[in-house]
Amino acid sequence: MNYIDIDSSQHELYDSWRKLYTVSFPIFEQRTQEQQEKAFSCADYHLVGYSEGDMFVGFISYWEFSSYRYIEHFAVHQGLRGRGYG
């Protein structure tokens, strides 16, 4: 499995991430496009995509602080859930 930092809305995996993000979390837990761009500008914010071959598997987003990491979102593609990716 490959781990890929998604660091902007211009990243090649951004659209795959956004699709999974919007179907995996209720609207009140989702960022707007503007809010996501602001998160990308913070050094503490990380969005990591996971792929296997050319298949987008899932992602994790987290904030890394000096004494802890806060996992904000984690999701696996609907068709791949229950297969050990999480």
Where in the sequence are the language-model features?
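Low-complexity, flexible helical/coil segments
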Residues: S8-H11, A39-A43, G86
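Intrinsically disordered, low-complexity segments enriched in polar/charged residues with Gly/Pro
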Residues: E34-E37, Y62
